[in-house]
């Protein structure tokens, strides 16, 4: 007699952003935008999961759980910790997707681990998991002329300009391709 056991190796893809329509299409919500784009392409449905303080979508084909924490950007670690505990996963099983105003607009940088580099969402995950040993994908949102005029806080909450908005689908497609290969 044979017993077959399926080992479930799920990855959790966490897109950073702030809940609420007033933050739609802001630089800080690029993680949410990336997951929304991916979910649309793969015909996934979002579900509210209050126990995770998040909205999630499952991609069974690729063994992924997409997560948009509803805690606000700087407290994303609360949701991540709850999800990892629930599914009995490790920090290395997540992929954090966040904006980075120090990277050229649309540039994508992947790291297996590392410091938060000033990103409060990454700091929150590091604090709640007790490690910075988790993968992250930083997406460039740099616009130095605008940032120098309005400051960092207002910059990350600013909307994309027309030229950036036009390039956005290409950037989101590239992120989606990365997620599938990840």
Regions found by a protein language model. Give the residues of each.
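Catalytic tyrosine of NAD(P)H-dependent dehydrogenase/reductases that use a Tyr as the general acid/base
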Residues: 115
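Nucleotide and nucleotide-moiety/phosphate-recognizing core
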Residues: 2-112, 123, 127, 133-137, ...
């Amino acid at each position: 007699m044979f017993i077959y056991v399926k080992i479930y190796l799920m990855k959790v893809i966490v897109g950073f952003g702030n809940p609420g329509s007033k933050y739609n299409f802001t630089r800080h919500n690029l993680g949410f935008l990336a997951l929304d784009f991916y979910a649309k392409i793969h015909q996934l449905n979002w579900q509210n999961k209050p126990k995770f303080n998040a909205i999630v979508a499952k991609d069974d084909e690729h063994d992924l759980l997409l997560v948009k924490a509803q805690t606000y950007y700087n407290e994303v670690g609360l949701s991540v910790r709850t999800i990892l505990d629930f599914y009995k996963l490790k920090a290395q099983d997540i992929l954090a997707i966040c904006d980075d105003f120090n990277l050229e607009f649309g540039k994508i940088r992947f790291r297996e681990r590392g410091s938060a580099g000033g990103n409060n969402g990454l700091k929150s995950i590091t604090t709640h998991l007790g490690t910075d040993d988790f993968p992250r994908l930083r997406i460039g949102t740099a616009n130095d002329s605008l940032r120098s005029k309005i400051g960092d806080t207002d910059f990350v909450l600013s909307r994309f300009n027309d030229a950036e908005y036009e390039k956005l689908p290409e950037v989101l497609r590239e992120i989606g391709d990365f997620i599938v290969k990840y």
